[in-house]
Amino acid sequence: ILSRQDVITGLLPASTAINAHGDYTDAWVRDNVYSILSVWGLSLAYKKHAPEHYRAHILKQSVVKLMRGLLIAMMRQSNKVEAYKQSHNPLDALHAKYATDTGLAVVGDDEWGHLQLDATSLFVLMIAQMTASGLSLIYTMDEVDFVQNLVHYISRTYSTPDYGIWERGNKINHGTAEINCSSVGMAKAALEAMSGFNLFANSKSQEGVIHIVAND
């Protein structure tokens, strides 16, 4: 897995394949988070059994590098998060995938089913869980504010049709968004994990605490 990690962005390509069906060398948010979980798990094993081994540090920082690569890619589209909170228009959604080597957008707003709330929720959930495990993922107040905005972004998943884990909308492949239980469940888990969570980990300061409003 780590042999495929981009040395600059920290992102992982979904595949090395470029064929008639498309270019799969892009970095999907969902694929990246799920892929790096194995590295995170191995880093926790080293932390417990061989904390002084160099691999304990390398594995941990490889996870940080990927998660921050995704964070930076999303923060470049922070204007879309603000727009979506007001419009709930799928065209205002954060992109579902980015260029592996730059973290920049690779397809237009209307060229992909970008509104995949399970992927965004998974990212938010793992920020909480990885931070709780001892990783330092969030560095500044700008980043805290953005994660707080992501919480608002996913808060209406229970009533929001999206393209979900299937990416193509409803199951007959017509590209029509629908409410997906996989998205609803992941959003619920993310909101529960983030409620009152301090992104600055062991800091006694309250500035890094994420708030979930009652309606969320």
PLM feature segments, named:
Residues 1-216:
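Acidic, mature catalytic/reactive cores of soluble proteins
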